[in-house]
Amino acid sequence: TKVVLSTAGPFARYGSLLVQACVEKEAHYTDITGENHWVRGLIDKHHEEAASKGIRIIPSCGYDSIPSDIGAFFTITQFGKSVSRVDVYHEALGGASGGTTETMFTMDGLSKEMRDPFVLNPKETVSEEQREKSKDGFTIEQIDGVEGWTGMGMMAVANTRVVRRSAALMEQNQKPYGNNFTFGEHGLFSTKRMA
C-alpha cells in the first residue's frame, strides 16, 4: 500500500494536483490542512472515484483537527450509547506557521456557502435541529464545570466541520454518534480579556 503524507500548505495552492495523482496512481493521501473550502472541492472531485478504488483521502490530520475529531469519536465509544452533543475546550500556546497564516488570509473572501457549518457533510445528511444547534459562536462566557473563560478557538471553524463530516459518514455506515448529533469547539482562556 502506498501512502502520501503532505505537511506543507496552503493546500489549495499546492495540494490539488498531488491528490489527483494519488487517485490516479491508487495511493492513499493524508495531510494537515485546515482549508475546508479546498477539502469540499476534493470531496466533490475525488470522493466517488477514490471510494470505488478503495483509496482513502484523509485531509485534516494535523494537530489542529485530530484532537477534536478523535476526541469526539473516543467520547462516543466510551459512553457506549447514543450521545447528542459533544463540546470540547482547547487551551493552546504558541502561534501559527507561515503556511497557516497565509491560509487565514486567503479564506477571508470565501462565499457564504463555504462558511456553512456543514460544508463538508454529504448532501442531505443534516437535520434542522442539527443546523439550529451548530452555529459558529463568538460569545465569551464562563460555563459551569469549566475553569476559565470560553471564547472562539482559533481552529474551531475548521475543526467543527471535520467532526461533523466524520459523524455523518459514521451514520451513513450505520454507526451513528447519536440522534441529531451536534459538536461544538471553544477556546479556553484564563481571563476574560484573553478570550
Where are each of the predicted segments found?
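Rossmann-fold NAD(P) dinucleotide-binding segment
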Residues: T1, A12-D31
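Short glycine-rich anion-binding loops that position phosphate/pyrophosphate groups of nucleotides
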Residues: P10-F11, G62-Y63, T125
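Rossmann-fold NAD(P)-binding glycine/threonine-rich loop
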Residues: G15, Q20, T33-I55
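General beta-strand structural signal in soluble alpha/beta enzymes
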Residues: D31, I57-P59, V88
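Gly/Ser/Thr-rich loops at beta-strand to alpha-helix junctions
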Residues: N36-W38, G62-D69, L93-G94
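C-terminal catalytic/substrate-binding lobe primarily of soluble NAD(P)-dependent oxidoreductases
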Residues: G54, T77-A195
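Active-site-proximal alpha-helical scaffold in enzymes
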Residues: S68-Q78
